[in-house]
C-alpha cells in the first residue's frame, strides 16, 4: 500500500467507525435477517468485517458480490441498540453503498427507484396508474401493496377544508402550543399508495385545531441514500429546506420521512450555511402521532381490538413510542403485542429484492400479531404498511394510524 493510500485509510471516518467493532456478536441476538437466515454475513458483525477488509485492501476488489452484501441489510437499527460500541451500522452500510456505487456503478433497479421517486412527474404518473388499477379492480397491477379500504365507521365530521398546494437533532420534550402554520409533508409512498390515509391525516390535524398547508415537496431522500445516491439525497434535502422553512412546524405521517428530515443537518454537515438552515428546520419536524399527542387531540373511540407495530425509523430513529399508543388507547380497545418493535421485513425495496427472506420475517411478525386477537393492525409508516398488508384477511385489517384516530 502506498504512503498516500495509507494516509487516506488512516483518515477515513468510516474505517475509524468500523475499527470499533470487537466482534462480540451482540448484534446476532437481535438481527431479523440472522433470525431467519443464520449466516454471519447477514449480521452487522459480518458486514462491518467485509467493509473493513475492503477499505484496508485485504479484500482488494469489491464488485457486485460486495455490493450485494452491503445491500443485504434492513437498516432497521436493532443492532445499534445493543452494540456495546454504539456503532451505527445503518450509517456504515449507506456510506459503503455510496462508495461502491461510485466505483462499480449502480443497478438499473436502484437507479430507477432513486431517480423515479425524486421526479414529481414520475410520482404523479404512478399515482394515476395505481388509482386506475384499483378503480378497475386489477389488484395484481398494484402488487397487493395497498390494503383494502377500512370498514371503520366515520363519525360524521365534515371533510377537510380546501388545501393550498403550493445526525437527528435532539429536540427533547416539545409543546405544540402556538403552532399556527403547519405544513403536511406528503411522503412519496403515502402519496402514491395511501392517499386516503394521507387525507385522514390532514383531516385529523384540522380537527386538532391546526391550519394545514400541503406544500409542493420533493422526496425526503431515504430511497436515494439507501440505494447509493448520496449526492441526489443532498440535493433533495436542499430543495425541501427551501420549501419548508416558512412554516412553524412540519408534520409527516411517514416515520421514515420524519427521521430523514431530522437528519438533514448530518447530511449537509460539510456546508455551513445549509447545515445551519437544516438544523433550524429539523427542530420543527414532527411525526403525526407526536404532534397530535402533544396537542392533546382526543380521538373518537371505536369498539375495535387494535394492536400497533413500531416502525424502525419512528421508534429507533426518533424515539417515538408512547404517542401512538396513547392515541390508540383512547381510540380503541388497544392490545400490546410481543416484540412490537421487531422489523417487519419491508424496509423500502428490500422486500422486492429479497422476497423469500422478507416473507420469513413477516411470518414471525404475523405470529405475534395474531396472538393478540386484534381486528386491526396499525402502523405509522407506509413501507411497513405495504409489507404488513400482506397478512390482511382472516379477520384482520392493516391500517395507517390516521385511519383509526380520524374524526
Where are the predicted features?
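Non-heme iron-sulfur electron-transfer modules
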Residues: 1-7, 34-65, 86-114, 395-404
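Generic start-of-chain signal for non-secretory N-termini
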Residues: 1-19
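Cysteine-cluster motifs in flexible loop/terminal segments that predominantly coordinate metals
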Residues: 2, 24-28, 312, 347
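Iron-sulfur cluster-binding electron-transfer modules in prokaryotic oxidoreductases
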Residues: 10, 89-407
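N-terminal alpha-helical segment
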Residues: 13-14, 47, 66, 75, ...
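Cysteine-centered iron-sulfur cluster-binding motifs in ferredoxin-type domains/subunits
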Residues: 15-34, 67-87, 341
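N-terminal glycine-rich anion-binding loops that anchor highly charged ligand groups
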Residues: 26-29, 40-43, 211-214
Amino acid at each position: 500500500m502506498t504512503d498516500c493510500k495509507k494516509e487516506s485509510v488512516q483518515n477515513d471516518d468510516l474505517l475509524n467507525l468500523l475499527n470499533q467493532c470487537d466482534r462480540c456478536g451482540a448484534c446476532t441476538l437481535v438481527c431479523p435477517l440472522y433470525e431467519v437466515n443464520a449466516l454471519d454475513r447477514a449480521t452487522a458483525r459480518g458486514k462491518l468485517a467485509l467493509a473493513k477488509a475492503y477499505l484496508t485492501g485485504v479484500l482488494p476488489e469489491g464488485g457486485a458480490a460486495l455490493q450485494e452484501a452491503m445491500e443485504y441489510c434492513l437498516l432497521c437499527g436493532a443492532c445499534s441498540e445493543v452494540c456495546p460500541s454504539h456503532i451505527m451500522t445503518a450509517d456504515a452500510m449507506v456510506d459503503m453503498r455510496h462508495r461502491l456505487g461510485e466505483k462499480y456503478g449502480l443497478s438499473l433497479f436502484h437507479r430507477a427507484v432513486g431517480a423515479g421517486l425524486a421526479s414529481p412527474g414520475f410520482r404523479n404518473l404512478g399515482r394515476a396508474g395505481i388509482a386506475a388499477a384499483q378503480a378497475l379492480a386489477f389488484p395484481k397491477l398494484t402488487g397487493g401493496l395497498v390494503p383494502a379500504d377500512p370498514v371503520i365507521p366515520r363519525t360524521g365530521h365534515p371533510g377537510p377544508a380546501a388545501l393550498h398546494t403550493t445526525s437527528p437533532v435532539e429536540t427533547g420534550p416539545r409543546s405544540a402550543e402556538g403552532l399556527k402554520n403547519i405544513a403536511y409533508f406528503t411522503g412519496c409512498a403515502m402519496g402514491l399508495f395511501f392517499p386516503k390515509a394521507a387525507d385522514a391525516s390532514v383531516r385529523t390535524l384540522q380537527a386538532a385545531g391546526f391550519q394545514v398547508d400541503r406544500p409542493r415537496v420533493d422526496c425526503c431522500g431515504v430511497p436515494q441514500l439507501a440505494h447509493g445516491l448520496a449526492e441526489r439525497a443532498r440535493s433533495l434535502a436542499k430543495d425541501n429546506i427551501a420549501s419548508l422553512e416558512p412554516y412553524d412546524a412540519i408534520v409527516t405521517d411517514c416515520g421514515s420521512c420524519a427521521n430523514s428530515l431530522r437528519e438533514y443537518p448530518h447530511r449537509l454537515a460539510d456546508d455551513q450555511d445549509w447545515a445551519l438552515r437544516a438544523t433550524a428546520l429539523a427542530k420543527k419536524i414532527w411525526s403525526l402521532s407526536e404532534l397530535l399527542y402533544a396537542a392533546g387531540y382526543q380521538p373518537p373511540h371505536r369498539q375495535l381490538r387494535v394492536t400497533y407495530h413500531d416502525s424502525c425509523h419512528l421508534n429507533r430513529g426518533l424515539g417515538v413510542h408512547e404517542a401512538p399508543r396513547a392515541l390508540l388507547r383512547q381510540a380503541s380497545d388497544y392490545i400490546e403485542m410481543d416484540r412490537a418493535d421487531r422489523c417487519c421485513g419491508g424496509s423500502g425495496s428490500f422486500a422486492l429484492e429479497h422476497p423469500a427472506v422478507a416473507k420469513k420475517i413477516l411470518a414471525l411478525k404475523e405470529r405475534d400479531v395474531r396472538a393478540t386477537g386484534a381486528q386491526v393492525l396499525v402502523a405509522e409508516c407506509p413501507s411497513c404498511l405495504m409489507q404488513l398488508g400482506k397478512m390482511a384477511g382472516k379477520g384482520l385489517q392493516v391500517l395507517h394510524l390516521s385511519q383509526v384516530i380520524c374524526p
